[in-house]
UniProtKB/Swiss-Prot annotation:
This is Bdellin B-3. Residues 1-42 form the Kazal-like domain. It holds the Pfam family Kazal_1. The record marks 8-9 as: Reactive bond.
Length: 56
């Protein structure tokens, strides 16, 4: 596992995996591409923060 270094910038994006990430860097670090800006809709309500913690 390589550690990703991302800023704490809050610019939520919806990942291709249906997870809301706090920013594009975090989505990329988790192997997801950005589906669109803003939180995901129509999926379980959870997101991954800069610590890699999943919040539901």
């Amino acid at each position: 596992d390589t550690e990703c270094v991302c800023t704490k910038e809050l610019h939520r994006v919806c990942g291709s995996d249906g997870v809301t990430y706090d920013n594009e860097c975090l989505a990329t670090c988790h192997g997801a591409s950005v589906a669109h800006d803003h939180a995901c809709e129509g999926h379980e309500e959870h997101h991954v923060d800069e610590h890699g913690e999943d919040h539901d």
